[in-house]
């Protein structure tokens, strides 16, 4: 007979500093909302004082690693709106680990 169990296993992972900061900003902006935050890449770049490409790379890296989901938003006429970014449970875990390590406040 098999049963499902949940195990928490400490694993060392390597993440870029920029990824952690961008992920933490998404979490901060979304607050308690489980729906995430709709924001422009430029607004993230301005707040973190980094380039647009740096934010794009960080968002893509976080999405690929499963720390973040990205949903494209469109107007009725097909025009592009700001994407919606939502931090996943594993992203929350990464943010907490970064806080404990003193990387972010």
Where are the regions a protein language model picked out?
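Short recognition helix of helix-turn-helix/winged-helix DNA-binding domains
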Residues: 1-47, 54, 60-69, 76-82, ...
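Short, amphipathic alpha-helical interaction segments positioned at domain boundaries
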Residues: 89-105
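Assembly/interface hotspot detector across virion components, adhesins/toxins, and nucleic-acid enzymes
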Residues: 68, 72-73, 102-104
């Amino acid at each position: 007979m098999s049963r499902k169990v949940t195990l928490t296993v400490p694993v060392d992972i390597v993440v870029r500093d920029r990824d952690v900061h961008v992920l933490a900003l998404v979490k901060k902006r979304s607050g308690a909302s489980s729906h995430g935050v709709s924001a422009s890449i430029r607004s993230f770049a301005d707040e973190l004082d980094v380039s647009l490409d740096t934010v794009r790379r960080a968002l893509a890296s976080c999405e690929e690693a499963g720390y973040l989901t990205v949903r494209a938003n469109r107007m009725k006429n097909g025009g592009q709106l700001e994407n919606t970014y939502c931090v996943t449970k594993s992203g929350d875990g990464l943010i907490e680990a970064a806080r404990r390590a003193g990387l972010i406040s």
